[in-house]
């Protein structure tokens, strides 16, 4: 599905990149770091189901799903933070995660919030 036409002032996932500049655009102002943090824990039922999956090997789908949801939530929070800063793009976006306790994981998504103009 094609993304609807957006104004240059709108921040959309299409204007988020891991590169240090957004192709086809010129960075006119850096607004600081935008970030989104999510702390997730596994439920007892989920941990039990995942431990059963480890017996058979392969992808542990319960944990994969948990990680994907946490990354998406952190990404969405980063977008909201960047919008508060007045950004219409994010460059140098990264993810990081850390286990901060038994079964508790922090996922952070961060990048540089910027204002860009479209190249002629």
Curated annotation (Swiss-Prot):
InterPro entries: UPF0145_dom_sf (IPR035439), UPF0145_YbjQ-like (IPR002765)
Transmembrane segments annotated in the record for this chain: none
UniProt cross-references to SUPFAM superfamilies, sorted A to Z: YbjQ-like
Identification of the protein by name: UPF0145 protein Bcenmc03_5217
PANTHER family the record matches: UPF0145 PROTEIN SCO3412, UPF0145 PROTEIN YBJQ
Family designation: Belongs to the UPF0145 family.
Lineage top rank: taxon: Bacteria
Naturally occurring in which organism (per UniProt): Burkholderia orbicola (strain MC0-3)
Coiled coil stretches, renumbered: none
Organismal lineage: Bacteria, Pseudomonadati, Pseudomonadota, Betaproteobacteria, Burkholderiales
